[in-house]
Amino acid sequence: MKLEWPTIIFMLAMHCLAIVALQPQYWSWGVIVVFFFLSVLTGCLGVTLGYHRLLSHRAFKTPRWLERFFATCGALSAEYGPIEWVTVHREHHKYSDTDLDPHDINKGFWWAHFGWMMVDVPALEDKSKLAPDLVRDPYYMWLHDYYLWLQLPLGLLLYSLGGWAFVLWGIPLRLVAVYHLTWCINSVAHTWGTQPLDSGDNSRNNPILGIIAFGEGWHNNHHAHPSSAKQGLQGQFDLTWYIILTLEKLGLAKNIRLPS
């Protein structure tokens, strides 16, 4: 396996800067608001709703402008551009918890959590096969090429609003928090929790992640019904599903797919 040094260096830098952000001189109510606002914007609307349920699984439809807005929020999470994220996720579902799964939990907890992305990912060679709907869209190709650069205008905006404190809390600390929240679905939610449904893999329903990861923690439900826009079943809290319902009421979401 070939080490992905750009990814390793970037991740180390973000984690080091996240530690800097936690120094007392950077604390204020303002930075907390910025942190949570951008975490929900990029982690919930961007990754969970946009990258995952909308683009990866096509669990519902939105107007093109809104789909691209959610994809842009996802790109601001710096968890790959939409094409690579969707490619890896579709490969994960195709080979869940087998040797061909990019983040196979059977290779170890830390491999599934983040180790897999520190080496070359064979699935990314199949972008045109696994994500043809995105590859042929010029805007998604643009995000694929430039998603990391989106942190630059965001950083300038944050600096103009609150100096380095806003930058540190709004970019590296927020990125690291959303990273680990997403990664926990690949690791924690394939290790600890309940399996009420037969999904044919190690996916688990983890109530803690169900709440703090915007509904993604109901992971056994998801693997049993991957094309469903609703992951929390029978009263399980699923923030992303409530947002999709709101979009439907506003006439901005349709063809919503539910568990069979």
Model feature map: region roles:
Residues R53, S187, T191, H223:
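Catalytic glutamate of the conserved HExxH
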Residues M1-C184, S228-S260:
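Non-catalytic, topology-defining segments of multipass membrane proteins
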